[in-house]
Regions:
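Conserved hydrolase catalytic core segment
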Residues: 87-126
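Catalytic histidine-centered segment of alpha/beta-hydrolase-like enzymes
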Residues: 268-281
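Conserved alpha/beta-hydrolase "nucleophile elbow" surrounding the catalytic nucleophile
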Residues: 29-31, 89, 93-95, 239
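Conserved alpha/beta-hydrolase "acid-adjacent" motif
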Residues: 243-249
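Conserved HGGG/HGGXW glycine-rich cap/lid loop of the alpha/beta-hydrolase fold
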Residues: 7-63
Length: 292
């Protein structure tokens, strides 16, 4: 569904299938991603609606605006929630989406039954290599994120055709190099590159600048201590193999909240919805069911 608001036109994924008798989960994706991730999250359909996701400005099918900060992203989603008039929401955010969820939960906690942040670190520091890569070479930035954020590849059928197949022109192989819309590179492990295609394509947006804008928004985001402590029913989920977040920083983050539940997801890293959706779905269901 498309919704026109004062802050721009938003695409709200799965809104048309909402059943008032079932629980509502609102998912906010990580940097550079959009509603496509929501379809990889599927809690028990007997209890929960299909996962809602509101594309941030310039992401997915929402129109671009001047929004470039976590606060502005949260304001955009808040306006949409008011327009569609929903409450009793299980709020869930991945990585940067977790920061947006924190801002939302602090601004109007009565709307949310629970808050789940997975693989989200606050404050979220972004290294210079990733900041530079996200602004100059999106594919290079995606390489960095998958190098440190993927522990295992999902089980997929091995392609029967040559490298670069799978029905997409995102990659082409020419003279031993892989050509993408964002640059060229040599690939030592073509099978891994093909296996990662399903994840890397989630970073494709209308503008190449989106990932860079998101990374800078993460770097610049800060909350008042009083606002952090005002967030209720908060749960921190981390992939035990995630090298993109620091366990020490997660512990410090939990201390900031005062009361937060920590759950570790076994055998996955930063992108559990890609690596092993069953692990993520099981963990999220355990969290949500606590507040029903």
């Amino acid at each position: 569904m498309f919704l026109k608001t004062d802050s721009g036109t938003a695409y709200i994924h799965n809104f048309d299938s909402l059943d008032s008798e079932k629980e509502i989960v609102l998912f906010i994706p990580g940097a550079g991603m959009d509603h496509r991730v929501a379809d990889l999250i599927s809690p028990n359909p007997k209890i929960f609606n299909k996962v809602l996701s509101i594309d941030l400005p310039g992401h997915g099918s929402s129109t671009p605006t001047e929004a470039k900060s976590i606060q502005e992203y949260a304001g955009f989603i808040s306006n949409c929630i008011k327009e569609i008039d929903i409450s009793g929401i299980h709020l869930c955010g991945h990585s940067m989406g977790g920061l947006v969820a924190m801002e939302l939960a602090a601004s109007d906690s009565k709307l949310f039954k629970s808050v789940a942040l997975f693989n989200c670190q606050y404050p979220l520091f972004v290294g210079s290599a990733l900041l530079d890569g996200s602004s100059r070479n999106l594919d290079g930035a995606a390489d960095f994120l998958t190098k440190y954020g993927i522990h295992k590849l999902p089980k997929i059928e091995k392609p029967k055709k040559t490298f670069g197949s799978m029905g997409s022109s995102f990659y082409k192989k020419t003279d031993g190099k892989v050509i993408s819309p964002y640059g060229s590179k040599e690939v030592r492990d073509p099978d891994r590159e093909v296996a990662l295609f399903g994840l890397k394509k989630l970073f494709n947006q209308v503008s190449k600048d989106i990932l860079s804008i998101d990374m800078n928004a993460c770097m610049n985001y800060r909350m008042d201590d009083s606002d952090i402590k005002s967030i209720n029913n908060i749960n921190i989920l981390i992939g035990e193999m995630d090298k993109l977040v620091s366990e020490k920083k997660i512990d410090e983050m939990i201390s900031m909240f005062g009361s937060a539940q920590l759950k570790k997801m076994e055998g996955v890293a930063h992108f559990p919805f890609f690596e092993d959706p069953k692990v993520l779905n099981k963990t999220l269901e355990e969290v949500f069911n606590t507040y029903i």
